[in-house]
UniProtKB/Swiss-Prot annotation:
Keywords: Cytoplasm, Phosphoprotein, RNA-binding, Transposable element. It is found in: Cytoplasm. Residues 299-401 are annotated as: RNA-binding. This is Transposon Ty1-DR1 Gag polyprotein. The C-terminal RNA-binding region of CA is sufficient for all its nucleocapsid-like chaperone activities. It comes from the Eukaryota. Residues 1-93, 126-173, 352-440 are annotated as: Disordered. Capsid protein (CA) is the structural component of the virus-like particle (VLP), forming the shell that encapsulates the retrotransposons dimeric RNA genome. The particles are assembled from trimer-clustered units and there are holes in the capsid shells that allow for the diffusion of macromolecules. CA also has nucleocapsid-like chaperone activity, promoting primer tRNA(i)-Met annealing to the multipartite primer-binding site (PBS), dimerization of Ty1 RNA and initiation of reverse transcription. The record marks H401, N402 as: Cleavage. Induction: Ty1-DR1 is a weakly expressed element. Induced under amino acid starvation conditions by GCN4. Residues 1-10, 48-60, 127-152, 419-428 have a biased composition (Polar residues). Retrotransposons are mobile genetic entities that are able to replicate via an RNA intermediate and a reverse transcription step. In contrast to retroviruses, retrotransposons are non-infectious, lack an envelope and remain intracellular. Ty1 retrotransposons belong to the copia elements (pseudoviridae). Residues 429-440 have a biased composition (Basic and acidic residues).
């Protein structure tokens, strides 16, 4: 009968568990079955009133009407969890649903199994709300983008918030090998750029253009772990995630540095294979350029031995340096340092010969003075400097004859030639010569 009375009070619950009632727990002389009809009516009214008002559980300090029995109470149940991780590690609804993301660019739209070490950004709600990815996920980037009829359709608010972002963004392929990570991260960066997140990608100096927001960091983390499973990540990426499993920005920054290093390596190899030297630049500068390239390649894991380096250097030599290809008797065991000793020797010899050439040349001022002291027979005006020149000058033939005979004929002839030309010439008419009238 007492159990029937307790069943009439389902709203009464004190404590954390239902306590059983036995005859040993009742310490009273009053017969528990001896209850008046008026009290039973009061009990019925109280039970009806409690059921109609749907009262909550009273405080633990409340005293039951029957002080001799422990009040039954159901055990407390913790609130349900959205996933296998504590509730304080979950994202808020605002974080999980940022506006403005295009398709494949919404964190709450991506189904995934999170890393075992990363419970922070597990999306709330049942997993059934996330649609499965279409068959294009994990395929090469040349595959056409999925059609809108088979995929999630953005709401009008999401469409209005999108600016330059495409309606459908092609997702990156799935990473399937640690060796493919350098190529995969390039497609992932392209995916972020198409998702209107180019400003958060680190630049050449390792810093992004703008600060990343919490929603963008959530999106970055979720998409990275979806398309790059942890078992296929390189060791250096796992080392970063072991320190901070949300530091995707550091992974991107290191990846960009490696891309630049790879580009520099390719440029160094091309430069080394196309060396050209003919002595137009100092030998020291040429040696510094070549040794820096070789050291940089060796530091990046591309070993260039002496034999290969010497062959590449000698192939680019020209001019006076070209004979080093054939006259060198230590081709097999020659080092880069020994080859540059020969290059320096030729360069110094060239510089010495160039510096000594002006010592053997005549000074232009000396040439002018010498031209005044020597007789030039081709220019009579320069040679004829007779101060006793008369008005009746000799012809060019007579002057030339005088000059030529002045050095060879005896002094008597010179005296006869030096006589005045104004005296008349007497002709001896032995051969009965007749002159024309008026000529004498």
């Amino acid at each position: 009968m007492e159990s029937q009375q307790l069943s009439n009070y389902p709203h009464i619950s004190h404590g954390s568990a239902c306590a059983s009632v036995t005859s040993k727990e009742v310490h009273t002389n009053q017969d528990p079955l001896d209850v008046s009809a008026s009290k039973i009516q009061e009990y019925d009214k109280a039970s009806t009133k409690a059921n109609s008002q749907q009262t909550t559980t009273p405080a633990s300090s409340a005293v039951p009407e029957n002080p001799h029995h422990a009040s039954p109470q159901p055990a407390s149940v913790p609130p349900p969890q959205n996933g296998p991780y504590p509730q304080q590690c979950m994202m808020t609804q605002n974080q999980a649903n940022p506006s403005g993301w295009s398709f494949y660019g919404h964190p709450s739209m991506i189904p995934y199994t999170p890393y075992q070490m990363s419970p922070m950004y597990f999306p709330p709600g049942p997993q059934s709300q996330f649609p499965q990815y279409p068959s294009s996920v994990g395929t090469p980037l040349s595959t056409p983008s999925p059609e809108s009829g088979n995929t999630f359709t953005d709401s009008s608010s999401a469409d209005s918030d999108m600016t330059s972002t495409k309606k459908y963004v092609r997702p990156p392929p799935m990473l399937t090998s640690p060796n493919d990570f350098p190529n995969w991260v390039k497609t992932y960066i392209k995916f972020l750029q198409n998702s209107n997140l180019g400003g958060i990608i680190p630049t050449v100096n390792g810093k992004p253009v703008r600060q990343i927001t919490d929603d963008e960091l959530t999106f970055l983390y979720n998409t990275f772990q979806i398309f790059a499973p942890s078992q296929f990540l390189p060791t250096w990426v796992k080392d970063i995630l072991s320190v901070d499993y949300t530091d995707i920005m550091k992974i991107l920054s290191k990846s960009i540095e490696k891309m630049q290093s790879d580009t520099q390596e390719a440029n160094d190899i091309v430069t080394l294979a196309n060396l050209q030297y003919n002595g137009s630049t100092p030998a020291d500068a040429f040696e510094t350029k070549v040794t820096n390239i070789i050291d940089r390649l060796n530091n990046n894991g591309i070993h260039i031995n002496n034999k290969v380096a010497c062959q590449l250097i000698m192939r680019g030599l020209s001019g006076e340096y070209k004979f080093l290809r054939y006259t060198r008797h230590r081709h097999l065991n020659m080092t880069v340092a020994e080859l540059f000793l020969d290059i320096h020797a030729i360069y110094e010899e060239q510089q010495g010969s160039r510096n000594s050439k002006p010592n053997y040349r005549r000074n232009p001022s000396d040439e002018k003075n010498d031209s005044r002291s020597y007789t030039n027979t081709t220019k009579p005006k320069v040679i004829a400097r007779n101060p006793q020149k008369t008005n009746n000058s000799k012809s060019k033939t007579a002057r030339a004859h005088n000059v030529s005979t002045s050095n060879n004929s005896p002094s008597t002839d010179n005296d006869s030639i030096s006589k005045s030309t104004t005296e008349p010439i007497q002709l001896n008419n032995k051969h009965d010569l007749h002159l024309r009238p008026g000529t004498y």
